Amino acid sequence: MSHGTYYECEPRGGQQPLEFSGGRAGPGELGDMCEHEASIDLSAYIESGEEQLLSDLFAMKPTPEARSLKGPGTPSFPHYLPADPRPFAYPSHTFGPDRKALGPGIYSNPGSYDPRAVAVKEEPRGPEGNRGTGRGSYNPLQYQVAHCGQTAVHLPPTLAAPGQPLRVLKAPVAAAAPPCSPLLKAPSPAGPSHKGKKAVNKDSLEYRLRRERNNIAVRKSRDKAKRRIMETQQKVLEYMAENERLRSRVDQLTQELDTLRNLFRQIPEAASLIKGVGGCS
């Protein structure tokens, strides 16, 4: 996996060091900043289109001790795993009518990559393109409709009874078909038609006891209403008698006031006193 254009800091035997076109900075300017760096030629990766650029860029640089221990047959990158000698087996299935299978020749030679060999499915653009879909695409709605059967809804001809439930007529479905969506379930047998009153025999003891309890409750409610009416009438009579007493008391006080006024008018001193008091006020 090593590349021929990868150069290390320490030159090997029979290999010329890499020279830069610009002037080299003195030891006083940069010091030992670039002592342990490695340089990579990116032109080979850009032209050939290989996918090992990031792995080579971030590969760990071997230490001087590791380089001194390497033998003549040791690879340049000790941290890489050895390649698998077994050939790569490509799958034999295809990806649908709209896609082409990737043959083994695509990865046999990394330098001969042809982007036209891989067919990329393009999505339709615009509102008209969304109507047609590929035959190999999966549609969950079509799957539910295919397995749930046909369902028809019967609407009444007139809207006179808005509370009347709709009748759902469902076609028979095969026994091997999976259950459909819970939104399309058939109506349960305990519907409105089965909610009728239970037939009770009027001659039975239970019916008689129930009627007797109902009659007792009705009589109690009627007696309670009668007592409330009598209490209300009694309170009305009491309020009327109190009103009569108050009226008689008002008449009595009015007569006493008139008598006192007549007495003060017959005494002249009292009349002048009353006039003087009235003038001062």
UniProtKB/Swiss-Prot annotation:
The keyword Cell cycle does not apply. Keywords: Activator, DNA-binding, Isopeptide bond, Nucleus, Phosphoprotein, Transcription, Transcription regulation, Ubl conjugation. GO terms for molecular function: DNA binding; DNA-binding transcription activator activity, RNA polymerase II-specific; DNA-binding transcription factor activity, RNA polymerase II-specific; identical protein binding; protein-containing complex binding; RNA polymerase II cis-regulatory region sequence-specific DNA binding; sequence-specific double-stranded DNA binding. The modification Phosphoserine is found at S181. Residues 1-30 are annotated as: Disordered. Transmembrane segments: none annotated. Residues 204-267 form the bZIP domain. Belongs to the bZIP family. C/EBP subfamily. PANTHER family: CCAAT/ENHANCER BINDING PROTEIN (PTHR23334), CCAAT_ENHANCER-BINDING PROTEIN EPSILON (PTHR23334:SF27). Binds DNA as a homodimer and as a heterodimer. Can form stable heterodimers with CEBPA, CEBPB and CEBPD. Interacts with GATA1 and SPI1. Interacts with SMARCD2. This is CCAAT/enhancer-binding protein epsilon. The lineage of its organism: Eukaryota, Metazoa, Chordata, Craniata, Vertebrata. The gene is Cebpe.
